[in-house]
Amino acid sequence: MKDRKFSRAVAIVIAFVICFTGGITLLAFKPVAIAEAISTTEGTKLDYSDGSHYEGDVEAGEIRNGTGSYSWSTGETYEGTWVNDVQSGNGKMVWPGLGTYTGQFQNGKRHGRGAFTWIYDGEPTTGQPISFDGEWEDDHIGSSGKMVFANLGIYEGGFSKGVREGQGTFTWDNGDQYFGMWAKDRISGDGILTLADGSLLEGQFNNNLLNRGTVTYAVDGGIATRNVLNGKLQSAVTIVYQDDTTVVGTLKGQEFVGNVTISYASGDSYVGALKNGIKSGKGTYTWKNGAHYVGEWSNDKMSGTGKYYYEKDESKNYLCGTFKDGLPLGTLIYVSDKKLQYNTVWQDGKCTNITYKKK
């Protein structure tokens, strides 16, 4: 007999926080003045009636072309390249106390590759965006990029209309990581969530929850796998231990209920009840050579009334009676291969007397 104490399965949470608080607020790009300058200095400095200023390259006296800096009367600044009097090419835009953008512009708008860094009055709250580095389209976050969230983690992947969409990876500060599909800024679609402790949630997610799939997590000395259906963790479990022992059963809380099936690396198997992770109640243990015991168990050993069959065939060659601590005890009936019956007396696992039993 091979003694084995099975660990209790651990509970696992399949809901998790992913969204930042509120939405992403992108500062609108302010247009530059197009009115005539009220003053010029050496053809490189322009002052406008709305209080804004430009310093840099110009053509035909007032057309901004080349490299230059522009400041609004409200404090915003732009420094970079200009084409035909609008920001185009590489540049830097600063909103005092709010944020900074460094990257590409086209026709006066953020367009192409660029990075935006938010600025907060004090420390940002958990989940607020800190920075975005990626593609921009028509002054909005484009199709892909990397966004960092305060005290939460980093997202890299697809975007649509400024929110996470399509395939992307979110890595939490605590080491958890999700790779898969997103929809409307939520985890939705096929994906894999790997927790820092090695647990794995894989399947179809909906609104940040695993809706259908599998959950794999560690138990003492092994790995457990359970299904998730309609967002609920199912009670059926398969546990594979490091020594290649496999347990298949049903959990209620952290305990097995009903019969379990245990397959050992040696080729032996057990089908029956467990209590506190050990064989207890009624069960059948089958050895690789076909011998098997059917009966009562206690403390992981044959104990109580049972039958020990010396071979696969249950019609002959078996011992019937009382067992204790894995051994036959007292008087048991032995049925031979010729279907003859004998009274046998056992002590300390040894047969001390045999008498023919008349029918």
Where are these regions (language model features)?
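Generic secretory/membrane-interface signal
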Residues: 2, 15, 294-297
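Hydrophobic helical h-region of N-terminal Sec-dependent signal peptides
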Residues: 12-18, 22
